[in-house]
UniProtKB/Swiss-Prot annotation:
Function: Involved in endoplasmic reticulum-associated degradation (ERAD) for misfolded lumenal proteins, possibly by tethering VCP to the endoplasmic reticulum membrane. May play a role in reproduction. May play a role in reproduction.
InterPro entries listed in its UniProt record: Ubiquitin-like_domsf, UBX_dom, UBX_domain-protein, UBXN8
Subcellular location(s) of the protein: Endoplasmic reticulum membrane
Transmembrane segments: 2-22, 34-54
Stretches assigned to the Cytoplasmic side: 1, 55-275
A Gene Ontology term for the protein's cellular component: nucleolus
Chief location category: endoplasmic reticulum
Annotated protein name in UniProt: UBX domain-containing protein 8
Gene Ontology biological process: ERAD pathway
Assembly and oligomerization: Interacts with SYVN1 and VCP.
Organism the protein comes from: Bos taurus (Bovine)
Segments forming domain UBX: 192-268
Keywords carried by this UniProt record: Endoplasmic reticulum, Membrane, Transmembrane, Transmembrane helix
The keyword Membrane belongs to this UniProt entry's keyword annotation: yes
Length: 275
């Protein structure tokens, strides 16, 4: 389009030249001279058109190359950004794996060694072992069970023996009118006293009750204690834990006489129903 416009401009500019040649005062200007003049003009126009077209194409040849270079640069930048992002992610994964698999275990090992050395220096190496609390089962049983099981246990035992309802409605020991059930236990000695043992009663409800006695106390005091807790001797008996056997007492025997010379756990058990 630009070359055509230029050709048109040169054609319009050639008309004045043609008019000037005609006005030079050559009356004998013939057809041959006009043809030569027009040929020169057209030759000049063709030459100019060729020059313009070549110049235009040469100038336009630089534009696509520049656009192509810009596109290539943008693609290269995007590619480099993507590569850098992948490298950063891979490096981050390597760092996290190193921290998790190497650095963290190493720090934990160093800390454990320092802790072991500290306890060895202070003489508290027992803290490095997995210990357990003594008597933990009994304490758990004591905490987990409720305090209201006296009348329930008596009532269930009476039902299994098909006893009348009047027997099951047993009042607390303190309210019993009979002299036998109003029991007075000896005063509990202090822990620092000599010749003292601790007796624990494991009740059917799961409770574990403890009390201190002098070894010289009568063995009958154990059954009095059981009665005061609400377990009648007609329904329940005492037995040792290991070996498991009924506790045998006699009148005039002390706790030391029946073998209770150290801290002991006794079981309150239901008596077997006689046929």
């Amino acid at each position: 389009m630009a070359s055509r416009g230029v050709v048109g401009i040169f054609l319009l500019s050639a008309l004045p030249l043609l008019c000037l040649e005609l006005r030079r005062g050559k009356p004998d200007l013939g057809i041959k001279d006009l043809i030569l003049l027009c040929g020169r003009i057209f030759l000049l126009l063709a030459l100019l058109t060729l020059i313009i077209s070549v110049t235009t194409s040469w100038v336009n040849s630089f534009k696509p190359s520049q656009v192509y270079l810009k596109e290539e640069e943008e693609k290269n930048e995007k590619r480099q950004k993507l590569v850098r992002k992948k490298q950063q992610e891979a490096q981050g994964e390597k760092v996290s794996r190193y921290i998790e698999n190497v650095l963290k275990p190493s720090q934990e090992m160093k800390l454990k060694k320092l802790e072991e050395r500290f306890y060895q220096m202070t003489g508290e190496t027992w803290k490095l072992s997995n210990g357990h609390k003594l008597g933990g089962d009994e304490d758990l049983e004591l905490d987990s069970e409720s305090q209201t099981s006296f009348e329930t246990s008596n009532r269930e035992a009476a039902k299994r023996r098909n006893l009348p309802n009047s027997v099951t409605n047993i009042s607390p020991p303190a309210e019993q009118p009979t002299k036998k059930e109003v029991l007075d236990l000896p005063e509990e000695p202090p822990e620092t006293a000599e010749e003292v043992v601790t007796v624990a009663l494991r009740c059917p409800s799961g409770r574990v009750l403890r009390r201190r006695f002098f070894k010289s106390c009568s063995s009958q005091v154990l059954f009095d204690w059981m009665m005061k807790l609400g377990y009648r001797t007609s329904l329940y008996s005492l037995s040792t834990s290991f070996p498991r056997r009924p506790l045998e007492v006699e009148a005039g025997w002390s706790l030391q006489d029946i073998g209770i010379t150290v801290d002991t756990v006794l079981n309150v058990e239901e008596k077997e129903q006689s046929s």
